[in-house]
């Protein structure tokens, strides 16, 4: 600028679009230079006829496109100069502000300042602070700092103050300040308090903080403003140009032509003006440093660039622009890349001429790209300064629209836009990444829905076809879905994890249509499961060692997610036989997808391994395979099951989908499948390839006893395959029964299965749970009964070994998933009324022995799958599945050493708590709780679905109840004492970990403490069973005597218990469980009639085990009583609690075997405690903490 013209003072303080903001400007007043800075008050006259008013400078900026130097000020008038005039309400020092800020060009503002203001006599005349005193005591810097921070919005005004000091501004005779009314009051109050002190005290930090104002001018005038008014004639002033108001609010409108700006700003002037100061303050810091350089360049550039096209609008410029556009369009058309539509940049259509001119001034494309100055071009175009991709977008548009022409003009070779290529590479890389992610997600979603549909319609369209070909193929598909090679166990795990991630995206789709997905998955899975059952079902010799590694994998917290699912899948597989397992597997995959947050590890395999060291390992592996394969396998049983209860299956199947995805790769190769499980358990989703290989080799080295490759992904089936589960349960229960008979019993048809399991399972499971699993894998009817107890034993044994690790994982999962999933389908039975449960038990028992045995077991499997689904996710927390763990642990009763291998979750309907009686059980309980919580959504759906199933069908009426009632009655009879022991154990366990195991507690289970409680209860039950070595909830003798008898007795006991418990506040629970399990805890009639009749006096209860469990073994997971048990007053009653502990202590704290104790605890507690919620007092006493 010219020496005597307007000049900006100081560095720019902000940049916003085409605006560059400044802190001060200098002009000449009466031949002397004067500086006005932001926040300054000065006298002005808008016109020579207008009264004197005070202007507060709030914003200074330059519009680069038009080279306008603009200001925004707030005007204050004396009351007498306002239309209303002064009245008695106005103070002598009061001024009234104009409601709208005025936008004035600096040249006009300077004219306003040129006037005689000597007549102004208003305002409070404050004593000035003597600068000499300030200089002596060094308070001047403090004052300047205060003014800078308080009065200048924190902007750095040092340069401006220095300029002012050089000009002697501080000693200006006329200085006026307008305060807010509160500030004015505080100031006057402070002056009154220090009236006898020297004025320099106003510079004290405390005086300033209390409202003091240190004015260094000779004649400071203090006024205040507390009101505004609308000035009638201000708008008519020619100097005011609101059309130039900076658009700093709302959606950025970019730089618009003046006429447009007038239109757009005319109505927004006030709001824009009001925000000018603050907006500038915000923008100032943002652009202060960046603007200093760009500003100068941009000012020059834009002045030259845009002055021609816009400001200087000369014919020459217009002609140049027109000629450029004609030549550009012609050239681009000739090179067969015509410019059809000019894109928008920052909500404004690009001006090609402006862009070209700006680029040329900066040196052209190559120079701008090398210097990374595309943001400058963007600013030239008036783009949104807040855009984070402005530079890239500008460069891409330039490359596409102008770069070819620029090269043509310069005589350069018309390359295929080499610079554009990098840009395209960035774009394409990002786009590819996005596409890859999206496509991967879509692919997974695609595959899962496809699998669902295929499974529904035909077991092998794509995924189904692959699955039908082999479980391994299905695993491959899952692996491909997970985008990880299936050969390595680590790869499998990674793939599964990726699948989870992709499924996490897919969950949007699959969760939206979980039932559908699960249904289809189960449909195709059922057939594929049948194939797998044929392939692997008959081959119980799956590597038990590999399964054990899987269990370790399940123990891994990171891997706990899949393991949780896997155990439930394992349970389902066992219950539904291999077909059922595979059926659930597909759903497991979708569930995995739906819950991608959970690590795609495969602890469930570990659970299963624990369940049967020999067979359970195979079972875990089989379940892992099934978990993956079920998605692609579709057996007719699964098909039916899907048709019967697709919704329930969907929820669990989603959880299982995750597990299945995890286990799918394992299915491909038993060794591989197991390796992922091992990997999951051993590692929280992160495993070195070597470790994975080792696990894989271990898994493959030890043949899984049951061919189920994690074969039962019950969670998958539980939602969509609830019905299929019933059907599959009938078929699978036999094959699955051996491996996961307990698990199956825990399924929705758990009542029937529980009865059967309890009758034939106690001794069988205790003796050879692994053998039974193998046997029942082959034979489905028996497996229905034994499936639960055995499967529970497997989880129990598994949980015993993995309890601590699993519990850690479970605790984490519980915390993570307790909130996300507030419903646990596995506890649906808890929601059923006792009377209904009784009828259901009878119905289920009847059906179990008849055709319903296959259907409802399928349902049980579904429920288990639900339960497992939840547990599997929790197992990511180190607790695969409480229910499956319970079964595994019970199995461990017979093979306590082997049990550690099994860590797969059992059905949610199954008593998951029994799995957690030991420290390991505790871990499993946590795992179950976590997975259950994570699967809470799915399971909640399952709950509804099961509830529907349960009510319509006696067997189904208590999907949870089935597991609970059947197993519970047996469990009760099996563990009259053990029940108390289990209760005690449960309390101990609850202190350790309380996964959600109660059917009725399903929603709460999803919560943190409650869900864990139930899991603990179930774990304790399982532990108690393990101790007593009784696989089924009934007496070992009773169980041995006959599953049928146990089933009938269970039904009767359930009915009786239900009858008693119905009145006792456990209507919605499986009363048979409570009463048989806790004779001492409950009222004499209830406990004695229900429990004593079923359980031998010396029968060890899982609760008993629980009591000792936490104390005895860190592996033992806390036993979680079903809400029924809780409501029964087991825990609420001090006497009962004493009895419980007595029972626990007396009835073999450890029991004859951990497996027996686990088994007992699993069935009775799981069955007895279907209630969703324990009384708070009971919960607190039974479950002191959610975690170990």
From Swiss-Prot:
InterPro entries: ARID/SWI1_ChromRemod (IPR051232), ARID5B_ARID/BRIGHT_DNA-bd (IPR030408), ARID_dom (IPR001606), ARID_dom_sf (IPR036431). Residues 597-609 have a biased composition (Polar residues). Changing residue 336 to A/R: Abolishes methylation and FSK-dependent DNA-binding of the PHF2-ARID5B complex to promoters. Keywords: Activator, DNA-binding, Isopeptide bond, Methylation, Nucleus, Phosphoprotein, Transcription, Transcription regulation, Ubl conjugation. Methylation at Lys-336 prevents DNA-binding. Demethylation by PHF2 promotes recruitment of the PHF2-ARID5B complex to promoters. It is found in: Nucleus. Coiled coil: none annotated. Transmembrane segments: none annotated. Residues 318-410 form the ARID domain. SMART domains: ARID, BRIGHT. GO terms for cellular component: nucleoplasm; nucleus. It comes from the Eukaryota. Widely expressed, including in liver (at protein level). Belongs to the ARID5B family. The ARID domain mediates the interaction with DNA. This is AT-rich interactive domain-containing protein 5B.
């Amino acid at each position: 600028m010219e020496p005597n013209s307007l000049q900006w003072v100081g560095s720019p303080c902000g940049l916003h679009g085409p605006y560059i903001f400044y802190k001060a400007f200098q002009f000449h007043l009466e031949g002397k230079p004067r500086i006005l800075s932001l926040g300054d008050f000065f006298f002005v006259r808008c016109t020579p006829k207008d009264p004197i008013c005070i202007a507060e400078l709030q914003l200074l900026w330059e519009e680069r496109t038009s080279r306008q130097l603009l200001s925004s000020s707030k005007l204050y008038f004396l009351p007498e100069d306002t239309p209303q005039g002064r009245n008695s309400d106005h103070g002598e020092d009061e001024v009234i502000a104009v409601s709208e800020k005025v936008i004035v060009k600096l040249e006009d503002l300077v004219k306003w300042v040129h006037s005689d203001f000597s007549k102004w006599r208003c305002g409070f005349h404050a004593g000035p602070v003597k600068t000499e005193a300030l200089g002596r005591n060094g308070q001047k810097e403090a004052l300047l700092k205060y003014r800078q921070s308080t009065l200048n919005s924190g902007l750095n005004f040092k340069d401006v103050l220095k300029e002012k000091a050089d000009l002697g501004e501080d000693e200006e005779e006329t200085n006026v300040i307008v305060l807010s009314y509160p500030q004015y009051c505080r100031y006057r109050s402070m002056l009154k308090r220090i009236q006898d002190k020297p004025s320099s005290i106003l510079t004290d930090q405390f005086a300033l903080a209390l409202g003091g104002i240190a004015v260094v001018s000779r004649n400071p005038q203090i006024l205040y403003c507390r009101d505004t008014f609308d000035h009638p004639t201000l708008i008519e002033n020619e100097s005011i140009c609101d059309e130039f108001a900076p658009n700093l609010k709302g959606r950025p409108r970019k730089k618009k032509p003046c006429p447009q700006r007038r239109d757009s700003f005319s109505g927004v002037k006030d709001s824009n003006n009001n925000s000018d100061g603050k907006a500038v303050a915000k923008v100032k810091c943002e652009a202060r440093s960046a603007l200093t350089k760009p500003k100068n360049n941009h000012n020059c550039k834009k002045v030259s660039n845009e002055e021609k096209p816009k400001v200087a609008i000369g014919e020459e410029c217009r002609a140049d622009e027109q000629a450029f556009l004609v030549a550009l369009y012609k050239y681009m058309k000739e090179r067969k890349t015509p410019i059809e539509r000019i894109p928008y940049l920052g909500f404004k259509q690009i001006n090609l001429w402006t862009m070209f001119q700006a680029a040329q001034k900066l040196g052209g494309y190559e120079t701008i790209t090398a210097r990374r100055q595309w943001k400058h071009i963007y600013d030239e175009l008036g783009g949104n300064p807040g855009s984070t991709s402005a530079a890239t977008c500008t460069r891409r548009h330039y490359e596409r629209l102008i770069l070819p022409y620029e090269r043509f003009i310069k005589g350069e070779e018309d390359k295929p836009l080499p610079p554009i290529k990098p840009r395209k590479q960035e774009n394409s890389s990002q786009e590819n990444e996005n596409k890859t992610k999206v496509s991967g997600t879509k692919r997974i979603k695609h595959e899962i829905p496809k699998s669902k549909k295929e499974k529904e319609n035909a077991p092998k369209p794509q995924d189904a076809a692959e699955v039908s070909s082999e479980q391994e193929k299905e695993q491959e598909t899952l692996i491909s879905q997970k985008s990880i090679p299936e050969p390595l166990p680590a790869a499998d795990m990674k793939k599964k994890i990726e699948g989870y991630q992709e499924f996490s995206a897919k969950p949007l789709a699959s969760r939206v249509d979980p039932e559908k997905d699960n249904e289809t998955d189960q449909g195709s899975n059922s057939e594929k499961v049948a194939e797998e059952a044929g392939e692997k079902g008959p081959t119980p010799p799956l590597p038990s060692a590999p399964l054990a590694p899987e269990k370790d994998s399940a123990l891994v917290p990171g891997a706990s997610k899949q393991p949780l699912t896997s155990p439930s899948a394992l349970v389902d597989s066992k219950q539904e036989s291999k077909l059922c397992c595979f059926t659930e597997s597909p759903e497991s995959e979708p569930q995995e997808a739906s819950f991608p947050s959970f690590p795609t590890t495969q602890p469930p395999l570990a659970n299963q391994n624990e369940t049967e060291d020999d067979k359970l390992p195979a079972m875990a592996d089989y379940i892992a395979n099934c978990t993956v394969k079920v998605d692609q396998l579709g057996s007719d049983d699964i098909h039916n099951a899907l048709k019967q209860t697709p919704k329930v299956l969907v929820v669990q199947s989603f959880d299982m989908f995750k597990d299945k995805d995890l286990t799918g790769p394992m299915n491909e190769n038993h060794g591989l499948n197991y390796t992922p499980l091992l990997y999951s358990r051993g590692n929280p989703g992160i495993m070195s390839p070597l470790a994975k290989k080792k696990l894989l080799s271990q898994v493959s080295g030890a043949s899984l006893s049951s061919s189920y490759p994690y074969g039962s992904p019950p969670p998958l089936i539980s939602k969509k395959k609830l019905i299929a589960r019933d059907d599959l349960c009938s078929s699978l229960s036999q094959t699955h029964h051996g491996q996961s008979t307990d698990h199956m019993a825990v399924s929705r048809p758990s009542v029937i299965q529980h009865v059967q399991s309890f009758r034939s399972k106690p001794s069988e499971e205790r003796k050879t749970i692994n053998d039974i699993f193998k046997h029942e894998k082959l034979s489905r009817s028996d497996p229905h009964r034994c499936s639960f107890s055995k499967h529970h034993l497997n989880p129990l044994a598994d949980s015993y070994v993995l309890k601590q690790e699993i519990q850690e994982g479970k605790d984490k999962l519980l915390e993570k998933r307790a909130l996300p999933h507030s419903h646990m389908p596995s506890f649906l039975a808890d929601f059923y009324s006792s009377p209904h449960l009784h009828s259901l038990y009878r119905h289920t028992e009847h059906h179990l022995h008849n055709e319903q045995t296959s259907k409802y077991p399928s349902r049980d499997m579904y429920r288990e799958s639900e339960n497992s689904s939840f547990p599997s996710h929790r197992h990511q927390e180190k607790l695969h599945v409480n229910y499956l763990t319970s079964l595994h642990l019970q199995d461990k009763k017979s093979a306590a050493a082997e049990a550690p291998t099994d860590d797969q979750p059992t059905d949610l309907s199954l008593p998951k708590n029994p799995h957690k009686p030991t420290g390991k059980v505790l871990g499993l309980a946590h795992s179950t709780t976590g997975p259950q919580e994570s699967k809470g959504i799915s399971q909640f759906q399952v709950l509804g679905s099961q509830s529907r199933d349960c009510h319509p069908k006696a067997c189904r009426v208590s999907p949870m109840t089935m597991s609970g009632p059947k197993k519970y009655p047996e469990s009760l009879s099996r563990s009259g004492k053990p029940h108390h022991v289990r209760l005690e154990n449960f309390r101990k366990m609850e202190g350790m970990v309380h996964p959600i195991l109660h059917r009725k507690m399903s929603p709460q289970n999803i919560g943190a403490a409650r869900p864990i409680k139930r899991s603990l209860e179930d774990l304790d039950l399982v532990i108690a069973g393990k101790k007593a070595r009784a696989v089924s909830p009934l007496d070992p003798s009773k169980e041995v005597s006959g599953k049928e008898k146990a089933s009938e007795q269970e039904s009767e006991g359930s009915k009786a218990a239900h009858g008693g418990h119905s009145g006792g506040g456990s209507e919605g629970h499986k009363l048979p469980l409570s009463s048989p399990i806790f004779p001492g805890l409950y009222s004499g009639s209830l406990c004695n009639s229900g429990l004593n009749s079923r359980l031998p006096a010396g029968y060890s209860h899982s609760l008993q085990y629980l009591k000792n469990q936490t104390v005895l073994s860190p592996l033992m997971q806390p036993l979680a009583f079903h809400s029924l048990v809780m409501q029964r007053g087991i825990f609420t009653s001090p006497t009962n609690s004493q009895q419980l502990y007595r029972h626990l202590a007396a009835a073999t704290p450890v029991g004859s075997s951990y497996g027996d104790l686990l088994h007992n605890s699993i069935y009775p507690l799981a069955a007895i405690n279907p209630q969703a919620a324990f009384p708070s007092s009971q919960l607190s006493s039974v479950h002191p903490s959610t975690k170990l």
